[in-house]
Amino acid sequence: MPTENERNAKYMTTADAKATQEAKELLEYLKNTAGQQIITGQHTQTIPCEEIAYIRQTTGKEPKLRGFELLAYSPNINYADASPECLKEVEENKGTAEMALKWAIEQRKNGNGGILTFTFHWFSPLGGRDKSFYTEHTDFDAAKILQEGTPERAAFYHDMDAIAGILQQFQQEHIPILWRPFHESYDTWFWWGAKGAKVARDLYRLMFDYYTGEKNLHNLLWVWNSDIEEAYPGDEYVDVVSIDVYLPEYQSTDYADAYEKLVAATSRDKVAALAEVGYLPDVDLLQKSRIPWAYYMTWSKEFCIGEKYNSVENLKKMYDSEYAVTL
């Protein structure tokens, strides 16, 4: 019988030394896919998952990777001082974690191998109004989280505990998650990036250490989402490096420039992903260039549905391509 070290030798090293077998296998799959094919992905944030229905109706297939949103699970939503738009978004997002769990279990039973990722628009742990994940709607100071004994730090850990409880349900079912906290920390529009990218980096490290060390969450693959070199948490904290790209207008692209900028600022030894895009990459260009994006994820609603951003022709081209991994 092979030893545990011998069994692990065939896998890419995970940031979490105690990562579950399923997480190790997922990371290895991503590594082996990158540059050979690209995994199709689509974000959703409501129970109906209208984006998936649209893709199925248009192409006859579904994305291999499905993104889910956790914003409604933020413990500190200020319902008394929220716009109708905010309240609608929260209401529509309720129940999506439970739906994600059900979907992932079904994927395993059916042998389809669908991949799950979470995005978390985290309402500020203290104070704030309306969509308080936006810096403009909260005076929450992320830098104070890094100081022992502050109310900000206590609230941060309180919220982390709440979200950990959700993630643990997936671990109990042996479901790995591409976990992308503190996304888009290269800018200041979210409170976790408002005090600079290095603060966001330190929050990411804090969460990694707490979730892997104290909460015993080992089903997560840790996705870093920034291309600022001085803010990179370090290889020991990261499984996947990623970037979000929203071009001002459509162009046929394999996002090669974004890839080079990302890996130059982070690591060429990690799996790389287009964690969010507005416009689909050109699958024909990708097949020629073999830029090693493991996956992409188109954003939700109008970025997927209709032809404001992605034409039916381009959507079909992606999902019909032998280079694209679909369900």
Q: Where are each of the predicted segments found?
A:
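Acidic (Asp/Glu)-rich catalytic clusters
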Residues: 31-32, 53-61, 98-113, 134-137, ...
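Aromatic-lined carbohydrate-recognition surfaces of secreted/lumenal glycan-active proteins
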Residues: 40-43, 180-182, 186, 204-230, ...
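Aromatic- and acid-rich polysaccharide-binding/catalytic face
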Residues: 66-69, 228-250, 298-299
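Substrate-binding cleft of secreted/luminal carbohydrate-active enzymes
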Residues: 5-8, 38-43, 269-327
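Substrate-binding cleft of extracellular glycoside hydrolase catalytic domains
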Residues: 76-206, 217
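Alpha-helical scaffolding within the catalytic cores
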Residues: 24-25, 47-55, 98, 162-166, ...
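Hydrophobic faces of well-ordered beta-strands that scaffold small-molecule active sites
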Residues: 38-42, 64-68, 114-120, 177-181, ...
